């Protein structure tokens, strides 16, 4: 990221389509075409991992396995693994702009089960699946077993499974369950084959058209995950895999009680003793999917907020030293120089800044944050940005521009309008996007909602809440000629064009 360029943040879930949720189908290829046409370089997405409670891509059943909601059904029909009759009449939800996750899950499962049977019955495809299974043996079998056993126990979280011997991976218990659940285990293996096959085709298409994929890696793992089940020694857990300490961030101006994320805390001493092998593996697997990798909550590698496991708020936590540069030194030694972006937002201190400098990764800048202080002294105001950074209007955790602007005070709105030289009648989204692309940051990333001038209810996520997040989808036809021309204009005007 050492030259001026730009891109768009748009998660797969938010792509339009007929089956209730975005996928790796034609709409994704059309989106690549849109990026190419508007001279973009990057497509930034959120984690592709399988989602769990709350539908958050940052709370996953696995650090590696893919979200099977993204498998495109039309492509399965094209490839003769499904028929149109298999999907006809299924209820994926009625609202094309907001995802109904319960309906999507219920409708897709029996359809995907039919596709799995067709693949296993096709000798050529079954052979490809077996090759995939062998290539990914270091994680796939454990994941498929975890998901099958989880379903066997009515989809309860790992810590609530009825048979505690299964939680503790008793050998005889697991052998019995493997035999009993063999068909379900195979299902979970095959749908992973489909996920990775379709993603590889889409990524190849993006790369062939000059578009690089920026992926995302959460720092933490869900307590209800295959990693906690198979490698409990790497986390601070009790004998039943329940977290003794959980992750979050302390109270601040935006949250009086802090944020309680609920993820188990790493036993960093155990990771160090194993030369951070799990982290090397995890990052290596990520770069099989992406060209660049945003690492979430980079502060947590410097110091992390550790909260007692039973607490209901983040108030009683404390800062505990993280692994620091020791981890990234090993990653560099094992994997070489990597295209990593550090999410360095929030409680950033000199120690974290030093870690970022030692690693050499670009950090992030959020344009919205610069205008709460109307004196011009904010550390987030655009005139203090540096070239070695990635600038955003906002991320998935922030308000869309229209919602953000509406919630400013009149003084803040007046200051913002004057600072960005907003023209009479100019939409605030366009004025702020223009400001973003004009910054000295080598990389500028615009959220799709802002390009489309969407209202407040299109926000992707409201941190520390569950139930109404990760739902927004773009509607067919929303990318108008006018919007494409505007994006192309600011991209070329500020020397970010990918020619």
What are the functions of these language-model segments?
Residues 11, 55-192, 196, 221-445, ...:
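Alpha-amylase-like alpha-glycosidases and glucanotransferases acting on alpha-linked glucans and related
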Residues 26-33, 197-205, 279-281, 428-432:
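Short alpha-helical segments and helix-capping/turn motifs at coil-helix boundaries
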Residues 37, 148, 165-168, 173, ...:
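Domain-scale activation on soluble regions of proteins
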């Amino acid at each position: 990221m050492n030259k001026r360029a730009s891109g768009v943040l748009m998660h797969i879930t938010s792509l339009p389509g007929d089956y209730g949720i975005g996928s790796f189908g034609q709409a994704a290829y059309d989106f690549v075409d849109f990026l190419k046409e508007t001279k973009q370089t990057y497509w930034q997405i959120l984690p592709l991992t399988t989602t769990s409670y709350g539908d958050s891509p940052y709370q996953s059943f696995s650090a590696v396995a893919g979200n099977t909601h993204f498998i495109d059904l039309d492509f399965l029909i094209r490839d003769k693994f499904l028929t149109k009759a298999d999907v006809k009449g299924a209820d994926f939800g009625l609202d094309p702009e907001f995802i109904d996750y319960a309906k999507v899950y219920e409708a897709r499962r029996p359809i995907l089960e039919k596709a799995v049977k067709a693949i296993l019955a096709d000798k050529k495809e079954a052979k490809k699946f077996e090759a995939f299974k062998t290539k990914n043996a270091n994680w796939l079998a454990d994941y498929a077993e975890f998901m099958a056993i989880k379903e066997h126990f009515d989809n309860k979280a790992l810590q609530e499974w009825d048979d505690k011997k299964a939680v503790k991976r008793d050998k005889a218990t697991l052998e019995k369950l493997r035999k009993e659940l063999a068909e379900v285990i195979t299902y979970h293996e095959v749908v992973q084959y489909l996920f990775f096959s379709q993603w590889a085709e889409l990524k190849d298409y993006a790369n062939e058209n000059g578009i690089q994929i920026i992926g995302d890696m959460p720092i933490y793992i869900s307590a209800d995950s295959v990693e906690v089940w198979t490698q409990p020694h790497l986390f601070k857990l009790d004998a039943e895999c329940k977290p003794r300490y959980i992750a979050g961030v302390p109270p601040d101006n935006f949250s009086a009680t802090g944020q309680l994320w609920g993820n188990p805390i790493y036993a960093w001493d155990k990771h160090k003793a194993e030369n951070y092998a799990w982290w090397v593996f995890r990052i290596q697997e990520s770069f099989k999917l992406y060209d660049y990798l945003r690492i979430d909550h980079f502060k947590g590698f410097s110091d992390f907020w550790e909260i007692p496991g039973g607490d209901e708020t983040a108030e009683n936590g404390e800062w505990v030293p993280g692994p620091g540069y020791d981890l990234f030194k090993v990653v560099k030694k094992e994997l070489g120089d990597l295209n990593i972006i550090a999410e360095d937002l929030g409680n950033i201190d000199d120690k974290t800044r030093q870690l970022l400098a030692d690693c050499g990764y670009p950090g992030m800048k959020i344009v919205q944050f610069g205008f709460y202080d109307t004196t011009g002294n904010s550390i987030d105001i655009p005139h203090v940005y540096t070239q070695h950074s990635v600038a955003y209007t906002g991320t998935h955790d922030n308000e869309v521009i229209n919602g953000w602007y509406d919630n400013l005070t009149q003084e803040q709105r007046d200051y913002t309008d004057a600072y960005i030289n907003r023209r009479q009648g100019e939409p605030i989204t366009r004025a702020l996007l223009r400001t973003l692309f004009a910054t000295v940051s080598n990389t500028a990333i615009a959220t799709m909602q802002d390009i489309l001038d969407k209202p407040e209810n299109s926000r992707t996520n409201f941190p520390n809440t569950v139930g109404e997040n990760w739902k927004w989808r773009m509607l067919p036809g929303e990318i108008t000629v006018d919007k494409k021309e505007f994006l192309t204009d600011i991209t070329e005007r500020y020397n970010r064009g990918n020619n």
